[in-house]
Design a protein with these regions (language model features):
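Asp-based, Mg2+/Mn2+-dependent phosphohydrolase catalytic module
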Residues: 1-8, 16-23, 41-46, 90, ...
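N-terminal helical cap/lid subdomain that shapes the substrate entry/recognition surface
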Residues: 2-112, 116, 123-124, 137
Length: 256
């Protein structure tokens, strides 16, 4: 089967954080606290932060073990209940989620080769989609829009929306169904051995591991290709689309 579509991871594949994660997370918490204070909820920042972090870390641990996603809105609502504060309505919880993620959205920036790679794949006639493990569907769309690349993707599937995480096959199957291609016609590009590479393999997709920096992983990596940039990934995809099973040499890894 010839390739018809490319599905990609988002964080650390197309975009990267411009600030340390701890700084970004603290800014998120401050933004959430400020929003709640404006609503008239009186809460000490340090106490609320301690409660929130405990719930956030528990949700993250559950996600890691069971591959389920607890969306940020649920985490915020639980933190308010634990703080013995009035639980906000659905609309206000959604707004609180948006305010929490605003600093983080601004911190995610494109890799230098992202736009040209996406443009090359689009010009090659390939459909594209995103599968992202994230606690906020809104944040994923906002990161794509802020960086000017949302228009490249006909399909955007998040773990927050699905409430399950990569590498579970259901999230890949949903994206394949939405984009309208078979696994054999689709390649997945991502940076995580466990979430991206093993997840794609479970549903019969070819995969490309984008190894931007050395990693230590207990999960065996068996991608069809390993590259160090999106440029190399694009050239590998073009080779597959043209029917070649060979990996391009480094000299061939330049976009036209």
């Amino acid at each position: 089967m010839l390739l018809q579509a490319v599905l990609l991871d988002l964080g650390d594949t197309l975009v990267h954080l411009s600030r340390p994660w701890d700084d970004v997370f603290h800014a998120n918490l401050e933004a959430l606290h400020n929003y709640l204070m404006k609503l008239g909820l009186r809460l000490d920042f340090e106490q609320f932060a301690e409660t929130f972090i405990r719930i956030f870390e528990d949700a993250s641990a559950r996600a890691d073990v069971y591959k389920v996603e607890i969306p940020m809105g649920d985490i915020i609502a639980k933190a308010l209940r634990k703080s013995k504060l009035e639980v906000l309505g659905v609309d206000l919880i959604r707004d609180a989620e948006v305010e929490f993620f605003r600093p983080e959205v601004e911190a995610w920036q494109l890799y230098p080769d992202t736009v040209e790679t996406l443009a090359a794949l689009k010009n090659d006639g390939l459909k594209m989609g995103i599968i992202s493990n994230a606690k906020s569907d809104w944040a994923v769309h906002a990161i794509l829009e802020k960086n000017g690349i949302e228009g490249f993707f006909g399909v955007i599937v998040t773990s927050a929306f699905m409430r399950i995480r990569k590498p579970r096959p259901e999230i890949f199957i949903r994206a394949l169904t939405d984009i309208g291609t078979k696994p054999s016609e689709t390649v997945f590009v991502g940076d995580s051995v466990e979430a991206d590479i093993s997840g794609a393999r479970k549903v019969g997709m070819r995969s490309i591991h984008v190894l931007r920096r050395p990693i230590e992983s207990t999960h065996p990596a068996d991608p069809e290709a390993t590259v160090t940039s999106l440029r190399e990934a694009a050239n590998q995809i073009t080779a597959w689309k043209n029917g070649s099973l060979e990996k391009p040499t480094p000299d061939e890894c330049s976009l036209i």
